Swiss-Prot record:
Biased composition (Acidic residues): 796-809
Protein name: Osmosensitive cation channel TMEM63C
Its job: Acts as an osmosensitive cation channel preferentially activated upon hypotonic stress. In contrast to tmem63b, does not show phospholipid scramblase activity. Required for the functional integrity of the kidney glomerular filtration barrier.
GO CC aspect terms: plasma membrane
Extracellular topology ranges: 1-50, 175-198, 449-463, 535-557, 630-632, 694-698
Catalytic reaction(s) noted: Ca(2+)(in) = Ca(2+)(out)
Span list, region Disordered: 98-117, 777-825
Protein origin, superkingdom: Eukaryota
Tagged with keyword Membrane: yes
Record GO terms (molecular function): calcium-activated cation channel activity; osmolarity-sensing monoatomic cation channel activity
GO BP term (any one): glomerular filtration
Family of the protein in this entry: Belongs to the CSC1 (TC 1.A.17) family.
């Protein structure tokens, strides 16, 4: 009887039937997806996807973690400022166990260094706002400023995306009526709520293209601000590898280059040696030397000091354990003498450990450009220029490239080269692939835990803490762990430069994070069985109950919103706490044999800031937010929150917790290239949605597909052009620059030739013999305070001690800085 009430023509009822059938199809799809995940804690139909509950829990835990950090920083202040220990008070802490009273110049002091802004319970929060880029640049180097500038550009980009997504895309999604009017339904905010016939779906595709354009423009602006520096490119020095190891006379290299390239003038040549063992012995003898100096000074004030040399003596300090006591000064003196003898013996043999690598410095960078161009053509079956001794030096086998910055070179890794390096790299990456892909993908771990009924007892309660917060916390935790595995795999690959190590780490981590945080969970492929069936079984999509429509379930978007919330609050707070580093720091202090070694631990605990790892992690969360910025626009504000908090945490950690790092500019350019992946993923997800919802031949689908192809083609073209442009700038850009003071090319060559050439020698080969005597202790001062020497009154004896202290500090300054992973210049 209902058919009698249809209007003539039957047009309206057909539309109503289409909507009803579509809704029934949506409901059946949801039922199938939820049924297939009935034992999974990831997909659950919760009020508003559990986002309010997860947000409240994260805010509370975030505040608790900040309180814990403030307490730890107040109680163990040295740990909160490890990077400053080396610069400000490592010397006097070593010799006197007290803070330095050395007078500071106005340029050395900063708001972050003052007692009121550095010692308070929560003063570190205000110091972040008062800290200027000039302070960070003077202490941490230009790479830190470039990284922070990159983050600010990403924040600005995310602000624009957030504004557009919340003011335009979100109202369009809410205007749909497919999922009802219940305000607790998270799906109303997603693209799933918009009917397939709605013309506003065009806005989603247009805005995806707009986001890509905005991203490209923003990164182009950041790229134009990157500084080119001569000390980074070292355009007048070439690194030549595959030189026969039996060649020890640099005159042969000079003769060949002069004959093959008559217009080129060689000013200096330095061969490389296997200094791995030598650097290890040097580190150990410096440690022993510091122990001797410390206890010699203490013995002059307090008499003979006895220590227990067993590694567990600090933990089991009672006399019942029976650890033998020895004279501290004598113990470290004998240890230093032994290590010094081994060091000198190894140094005498170092000339026999040539590596077939040489750094050749020319008078002008135009000369190096000629040689690099000739050898780059040699890769295309073009023989480089010959000389009368070509067969002797085997120049046709050489690999010639611009030398990296001296501070960028990891000298101890140069010994791993050739087939040995490639074999090591291939085996490590195969092992990494097997470990990460087959065992420890976070989505697979969460699914495996569900199979063992980890959350089954409370699933019946439909508790958002378990069904939403717990899985996202697990995904975040494993996402934190796995990049560190990737980092250590890059570390054991023995890259020759820190830039190369960081860049490889960044690329591998980013690809891994995108795969395991975005792709697998989005596709619902949370188990290996499901993944391989989807990959290889041609009948899988027809027979299985799990459809790809599950990708666009409302709660799947809520899962990523909750994940970004967890990363924004708990994630950034944990980065501030640095729990793994704190545990290592505590363990090293427990196993230190003496007070002197405790001081050594404090100095050497400050590590380099891992730009590759942090770039990858920042871009992962940015990519998650950008990928779902249109299909699930609620995620964008939390992505912006993450970027802001991440920026503040990194400012603090770079200044206070990590030592300066000098890198090649290529890693910053590579990070810019990877940012463009995010809007491309957004287009790909929108195309996926259009194909599933609208069909592959609909105009919106075709438009999205064409824009995706054009965006990928544009990105590839820009990447290739950037590679070519980088080669030209490396070769010729420095010719157009002048140094400070306006020196000409000839003057600059004369002044800096010797200094530049000497940089290309491992510092351990330039170190003088350590023969130092301790000085008396200066006036007592409470530890952890900074005193202005202008306000203190000293008598003649204290002035004399201060002069002696400054003399000793001058002699030992470079020695103590050698304890850090890199001595920044």
């Amino acid at each position: 009887m209902a058919f009698e009430s249809w209007p003539a023509g039957g047009v309206r009822p057909v539309e109503e039937l289409d909507v009803r059938s579509f809704l029934m199809e949506e409901n059946s799809t949801a039922e199938r997806c939820y049924r297939s995940h009935s034992r999974s804690s990831v997909l659950q139909g919760l009020p508003f996807g559990g986002v309010p509950t997860v947000l409240a829990i994260n805010v509370v835990l975030w505040l608790i973690l900040l309180l814990i950090f403030s307490c730890l920083r107040k109680a163990a202040w040295d740990y909160g400022r490890l990077a400053l220990l080396m610069k400000n008070d490592s010397l006097t802490s070593l010799f006197y166990g007290e803070q330095s009273e050395k007078e500071k110049t106005p340029s050395d002091s900063s708001p972050s260094d003052s007692e009121t802004k550095d010692m308070g319970f929560c003063s570190w929060l205000t110091s972040l706002y008062h800290m200027k880029d000039e302070e960070i640049r003077s202490k941490c180097g230009i790479d830190a400023v470039t990284y922070l500038s990159f983050q600010r550009h990403i924040i600005l980009l995310m602000m624009v995306v957030c504004l557009l997504s919340l003011t335009i895309i979100l109202p369009v999604n809410l205007s749909g009526n497919l999922l009802g009017d219940n305000p607790e339904n998270f799906g109303r905010t997603t693209v799933v709520n918009v009917p397939a016939q709605n013309i506003f779906l065009w806005l989603h595709s247009i805005f995806a293209l707009l986001y890509f354009v905005i991203t490209v423009l923003c990164m182009a602006h950041h790229s134009s601000r990157l500084e080119y520096r001569e000390d980074e490119k070292v355009a007048r020095t070439l690194m030549i590898t595959s030189i026969p190891r039996e060649i020890s006379d640099p005159g042969l290299i000079t003769k060949h280059l002069h004959e093959a390239y008559p217009s080129c003038t060689v000013t200096d040549i330095h061969f490389c040696f296997n200094v791995q063992k030598l650097m290890k012995l040097d580190s150990e003898r410096r440690k022993a030397m510091k122990g001797r100096l410390y206890f010699t000074t203490k013995a002059q004030k307090n008499g003979r000091i006895m220590i227990k040399t067993h590694p567990c003596a600090q933990i089991f300090c009672c006399d019942i354990c029976g650890f033998e006591k020895v004279d501290a000064e004598q113990y470290y003196s004998e240890l230093e003498e032994k290590l010094t003898d081994e060091f000198n013996a190894e140094k005498n043999w170092i000339s026999m450990k040539r590596l077939g690598i040489a750094f050749v410095t020319f008078r002008d960078e135009r000369m190096t450009a000629v040689i690099v161009k000739d050898y780059s053509r040699a890769r295309c079956r073009h023989k480089p220029q010959q000389s009368s001794i070509t067969t002797v030096v085997r120049s046709h086998q050489w690999d010639v490239s611009y030398a990296p910055a001296p501070n960028d070179i990891i000298w101890e890794n140069l010994s791993v080269c050739g087939p040995r390096w490639w074999l090591r790299c291939i085996l490590l990456n195969i092992l990494l692939f097997l470990l990460l892909f087959f065992l420890t993908t976070p989505a697979i771990i969460v699914n495996t835990m569900d199979k063992f009924n980890v959350t089954r007892p409370v699933e019946s309660l439909r508790n958002p803490v378990i069904t939403q917060f717990f899985p996202t916390l697990l995904l975040w935790a494993f996402s934190i762990l796995l990049p560190f595995i990737v980092y250590y795999s890059s570390f054991f690959e023995y890259h020759w430069t820190r830039s190369g190590e960081n860049q490889v780490t960044m690329h591998k981590c980013f690809l891994l994070l995108v795969f395991m945080v975005i792709i697998l969970p989005s596709l619902g492929l949370s188990s290996l069985n499901l993944f391989f069936r989807w990959l290889f079984d041609v009948r899988f999509l027809d027979e299985t109950d799990v459809k790809f429509q599950c990708v666009f379930l409302p709660d799947n978007g809520a899962f990523f919103v909750n994940y970004v919330i967890t990363s924004s609050l708990i994630g950034t707070a944990m980065e501030l706490l640095r729990i793994p580093a704190l545990l290592v720091y505590s363990l090293r202090l427990c196993f230190a044999k003496s007070k002197a070694e405790c001081i050594h631990v404090k100095i050497s605990q400050a590590y380099e800031f891992q730009f590759g790892l942090e770039y990858a992690w920042t871009m992962c969360i940015f990519s998650v937010s950008m990928t779902y910025s249109i299909t699930c626009p609620v995620i964008v504000p939390f992505g912006l929150l993450y970027l802001v908090l991440k920026h503040m945490v990194d400012r603090y950690n770079i200044y206070y917790a990590y030592t300066p790092t000098k890198l090649n500019q290529r890693i910053h350019a590579a990070a810019i290239s990877q940012v463009v992946v995010a809007p491309i993923l957004c287009m790909f997800w929108l195309l996926f949605f259009s194909v599933l919802r609208l069909g592959p031949v609909q105009p919106i689908t075709l438009f999205t597909f064409i824009t995706l192809l054009c965006s990928i083609a544009f990105s590839c073209f820009g990447f290739c052009m950037k590679k070519l442009r980088a080669d030209r700038s490396t070769s010729y850009q420095m010719s157009d620059q002048t140094t400070e003071g306006g020196f000409s090319d000839a003057e600059r060559s004369t002044i800096s030739t010797t200094a530049t050439a000497n940089l290309f020698i491992a510092s351990v080969l330039l170190e003088p013999e350590l023969g130092l005597t301790p000085m008396p202790s200066p006036a007592h001062q409470s530890y952890g305070t900074m005193v202005n020497s202008q306000s203190s009154v000293r008598d003649a004896e204290e002035d004399e001690e201060k002069d002696l202290e400054e003399t000793l500090e001058t002699e030992l300054k470079d020695d103590l800085l050698m304890d850090s992973p890199v001595a920044f210049q």
